[in-house]
């Protein structure tokens, strides 16, 4: 097997192949340009089904809020909690498991792949230059306060009570 892209999707696939014994008597090449895996992001999502990464969850919420100018709406999400996974814990778990299999290898800066007798998974998105793409960007900052300022039992998914500057802006507070 060959997995192009060793980010969240590629590593998740490799992990599932490994824990379900699909790599027995097989080789797996993961092509990823990064030099090292370290905490570089947080993945957050609504938990709609069980997953294998409960031990990587940094925080889980069953309550959230949405702010608009002069109003805050509070909602519950008991059946579908919102979870945040720490990428450092995720990388440590997956790479720890994959490194136990001598038939799994990571490669960087490959210019060419011999795909004979290989099944290739490409997790790198192709972006068409002639197509109008819609992007959603998040810039994250972790802050610490001397006093309790945030209620850690509720997260604010969208706070629109800020300058909009002719486009949509909001704060997202976990």
PLM segments and residue spans:
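Beta1/beta-strand and adjacent pyrophosphate-binding region of the FAD-binding site
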Residues: 1-9, 29-31
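N-terminal FAD cofactor-binding segment of flavoenzymes
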Residues: 12-71, 88-89, 139, 143
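Conserved beta-strand termini and adjacent loop/short-helix elements that scaffold enzyme active sites
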Residues: 31-33, 69, 76-78, 107-109, ...
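Short, surface-exposed, polar/charged, turn-prone segments marking secondary-structure boundaries
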Residues: 55-60, 93-96, 146-150
């Amino acid at each position: 097997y060959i997995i192009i892209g060793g980010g969240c999707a590629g590593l998740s696939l490799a992990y599932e192949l490994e824990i379900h014994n699909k790599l027995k008597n097989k080789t797996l090449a993961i092509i990823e340009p990064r030099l090292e895996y370290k905490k570089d992001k947080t993945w957050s999502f609504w938990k709609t089904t069980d997953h294998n990464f409960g031990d990587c969850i940094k925080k889980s919420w069953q309550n959230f809020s949405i702010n608009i100018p002069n109003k805050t709406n509070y909602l519950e999400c008991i059946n579908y909690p919102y979870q945040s996974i720490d990428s450092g814990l995720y990388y440590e778990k997956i790479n720890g498991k994959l490194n136990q299999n001598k038939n799994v290898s990571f490669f960087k800066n490959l210019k060419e792949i011999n795909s004979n007798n290989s099944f290739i998974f490409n997790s790198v998105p192709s972006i068409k230059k002639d197509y109008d793409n819609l992007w959603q960007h998040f810039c994250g900052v972790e802050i610490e306060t001397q006093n309790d300022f945030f209620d850690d039992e509720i997260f604010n998914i969208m706070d629109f009570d800020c300058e909009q500057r002719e486009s949509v802006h909001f704060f997202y507070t976990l």
